[in-house]
Amino acid sequence: MLRQATSRFLSSTHRSIRPLSTTAPSFIRIRSQASEPSPAERPPPVPENVNPSQPFEPEVSKSEGTAKAAETQQAEEPASAGTPLTPPQPEVVFGNTHSAASTTPETEPNVENPDYSKLPSLDIDQEAAAISEPATGKDQEVEGGERKKTGAGKKEYVSSQEKSRRMWIRAGYGALAVGAVGAVLAMGNDETTGKKQGGFVETFQNNMLELFDFFNKPAFQTLLPDPLPPPHQRPYTLCIDLEGLLVHSSWDRTHGWRTAKRPGVDYFLGYLSQFYEIVLFSSQPLYTAAPIAEKIDPYQAFMPYRLFRESTRSVKGKVVKDISFLNRDPSKVIVLDVNPEHVALQPENGIVLQPWNGSPGDKGLVDMIPFLESIGIFNPADVRPILQAYAGKDIPIEYAKKEAEAKAKAIEEWERAHPTAITGAGSGFLSSIFGSVAAPGSSRPNQPMTYLEQKRAQAQRIYQEEQKYWAEHADEFKKLIEEDKQRQLAEMKGSILGYLGAPKMQDGPKEEVLKA
């Protein structure tokens, strides 16, 4: 048999390659696979002394009965034990010499496959299943009325370090809660007397509102320093806005941002600074409004204090200027603004004007000077009733009418008291004999000025003297300002070097070198 297989293998190896056929495919006859193979293609016969393999006989456990083993053995026996094993017929393909040597896979005998799921080794004992799955409830009871211990109620093991850590965490949370409650209660006490302002609920509510107002109130509780002594402190405080009142900013593609100063700003600030402590109270941020304020008042002679967006507060999402943080008497404060929302908290202290749109011939700011100077001249105890009387009106026009009426009344009273004091054309011997009355509107040289006119003339002279003084000493003030900037810069550098640990710079050796 080995010899036949070897000869068949060698014959297929040394066989010459079949040349390509030029015959048309339609004339090529392909042998049918249903016909019997040639003797060379037939497999060798199986010897008669070859016996089939013994059937699989699994071992049966002692717990199972003989009937179950018999059923398993009967299921695993083949259908016909005496049938010889026949190899499969090879597949013949003409046209390829190598395909003749290849054989198809052997066909399985017609034997029923055994059912391995019924093996005794895969059978699970019911007692083992009961042990692996503990029962719950009533199933935990066993013989004798006892219950099995499942370990469900056993506590988790915690180390001493973990217990200590948890204890300190609980203590920290407790201390934080006690401190929060104590802080809320302490904030309800008066700082001077130490007494509570109200009940616990009212105190807690006020403290919580104050806590949330921290983000809405100004950055400082006191926006202005304490007033100066009487000779130097002005009796009234005038808070003025920047954008729309003193300047107007516009933007275009050609020039970018440009800021124009309103006509009469210098005269407005220089003249009213005699009667008012002028405070620039702008709703713009510091980095945008401060450079403009420096251009308007470089010496800080007329606007000594400047407040910006950080000094305002937010009420219902709106920017509001609260004068209660100014450290000044509200009855002596006037807020001049162009936005009604800015004076929403104290409307009785505000004067709302139309914003300036940048027109060059505007006189709205100068027209407000007579009204404001009259308050400084007559020195009322409270400015709020006066402002309320002009609320909703055109203040320059209404005040001009009031002033004209007051002057006419004063002249009439003076003429009634001095009927013979007549001068001018026709005044002489005949006038003294027949009498004469001055024409309406004619002026008399000896007619006295009103109190307002006298104070106004005096204020004008003071304003002119101040302007002359600032113009003559402008270079000196610029030099002082520059020296102050250099001094601040040197202090800043020294503080940084001192923070880093470097020694401070001494000016002594430098002076000695210069003298030498």
Curated annotation (Swiss-Prot):
Main location group: mitochondrion
Sequence ranges of Low complexity compositional bias: 64-81
Subcellular location: Mitochondrion inner membrane
First and last residues of the transit peptide: 1-17
Biased composition (Polar residues): 1-25, 96-107
Record flagged with keyword Protein transport: yes
Domain of life: Eukaryota
InterPro entries: FCP1_dom, HAD-like_sf, HAD_sf, TIM50
Region (Disordered): 1-119, 131-161
Any single biological process term in GO: protein import into mitochondrial matrix
UniProt cross-references to PROSITE patterns, sorted A to Z: FCP1 (PS50969)
CDD domains referenced in this protein's UniProt entry, alphabetically: HAD_FCP1-like
SMART domains found in the cross-reference section: CPDc
Membrane topology reported for the UniProt record: Single-pass membrane protein
Domain FCP1 homology stretches: 231-375
Family to which this protein belongs: Belongs to the TIM50 family.
Function per UniProt: Essential component of the TIM23 complex, a complex that mediates the translocation of transit peptide-containing proteins across the mitochondrial inner membrane. Required to direct preproteins in transit and direct them to the channel protein TIM23, and possibly facilitates transfer of the translocating proteins from the TOM complex to the TIM23 complex.
Protein name per UniProt: Mitochondrial import inner membrane translocase subunit TIM50
